[in-house]
């Protein structure tokens, strides 16, 4: 992680994960739930970029991140749950009118989806420890929720919305 990004996130904390201590069957159910969400969320995100003002699409996307949050917390994937919460809360604020829906919100949502798809899901599926530092993405979400101007280092994370397309791709996390 770049030094300047490390400095930005030094005060951002995430709960400690405990999913490796979870019963294998419960983890398997969690992985299956993620797979189901992927099937629904992938085309929804495409539709949302084409129709950003469709409230039904927005609400459904928010609900999927709500599910990722709750399920992640339940199985002990707490940092991933917090990341999903950052998206859910951002979308809640869009729905309530507290922040505008713009490309930053959409790209952030897409970025987190791809982090789940290409980085977190393979870890959960193979029951591995994660060394991915999700704090920059959570901090990015917090800045979006507060409608703050993004530091260039945080804004650069949004590039993952279009560039992250494979598990083995290096992201800097």
Task: Describe the residue ranges of each PLM region.
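Non-catalytic helical tethers at domain boundaries
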Residues: 1-173
């Amino acid at each position: 992680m770049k030094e300047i990004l490390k400095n930005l996130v030094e005060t951002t904390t995430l709960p400690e994960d405990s999913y490796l201590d979870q019963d294998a069957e419960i983890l398997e159910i969690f992985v299956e739930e993620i797979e189901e969400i992927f099937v629904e969320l992938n085309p929804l995100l495409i539709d949302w970029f084409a129709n950003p003002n469709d409230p039904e699409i927005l609400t459904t996307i928010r609900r999927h991140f709500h599910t990722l949050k709750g399920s992640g917390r339940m199985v002990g994937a707490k940092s991933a749950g917090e990341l999903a919460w950052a998206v859910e809360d951002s979308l809640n604020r869009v729905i309530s009118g507290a922040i505008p829906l713009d490309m930053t919100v959409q790209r952030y949502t897409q970025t987190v989806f791809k982090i789940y798809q290409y980085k977190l899901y393979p870890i959960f599926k193979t029951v591995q420890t994660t060394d991915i530092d999700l704090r920059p993405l959570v901090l990015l979400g917090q800045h979006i929720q507060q409608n703050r101007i993004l530091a260039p280092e945080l804004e650069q994370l949004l590039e993952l919305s279009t560039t992250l397309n494979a598990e083995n791709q290096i992201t800097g996390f």
